[in-house]
Amino acid sequence: MLVFEELALVVLQNQGGLPWDETLLLAVHKIAQPQLDVFAATLTKFGVFWGVFPVATVISLVLLRLKKWRSLAYLLTTLLGSILINRTAKLLLHRVRPNLWESISPEFDYAFPSGHAMSSMTLIAALVILTWNSNWCWLVLAVGSVFVLAIGWTRIYLGVHFPSDILAGWMVSIAWTIGVNLLIQPHLTKPSTVREDELTLDEEESIAQG
């Protein structure tokens, strides 16, 4: 969160990119070619509408079906809250998009922090927390890390975000998902009533035999 606050302060003082922003943008742009253009323009759509939203919807329905109310509340709160934080930050900070070359997939709203970076990171961070005590956790972490980095790369490759927009989006998303986790505690469950009944029955049998 401190990284996000520091970047936000710099953005308030300087609406353009940071010194290392332009260097990284130009370095990524050097590898630009038609095939990569198509790949990046397609892949970037999975950062929100083609990927994050469908996956979040399916998982929400599964949690609803399983009556995992805390987990469902956690997932929805983190994702919807992430959108609200992103929209608010963009309106308050008014950071313009990079203008180093003509993008094949232009964006016209404000840049800081990156919505795609926030959406992808929020989803993966939330899933890591939800699967923390299961065998799925490492798989989610591994695949999710590749996904998050890939989405971040597409935003830079397409020239629609400064690298600091991406970094800020990641940092605030991690802080947000952890904070909501501490509040909602999605892993907190009530003791199993079935187990309680079994224990009571065992006790009664022990008394009868005694």
Identify the meaning behind each predicted range.
Residues 52-59, 79, 140, 144-147:
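Hydrophobic alpha-helical transmembrane segments of polytopic
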Residues 18, 56, 60-136:
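Membrane-interface loops
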Residues 101-210:
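Membrane-embedded catalytic cores of phosphoryl/pyrophosphoryl-handling enzymes
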Residues 4, 8, 36, 85, ...:
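Alpha-helical membrane-inserting segments
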Residues 1-51, 91-104:
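N-terminal transmembrane-helix/juxtamembrane module of multi-pass inner/ER membrane proteins
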Residues 26, 74-79, 169-170:
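Alpha-helical transmembrane segments of multi-pass membrane proteins, especially transporters
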Residues 30-41, 63, 67, 71, ...:
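Membrane-helix interfacial "entry" motifs
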Residues 11-16, 67-68, 92-97, 135, ...:
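Membrane-interfacial segments
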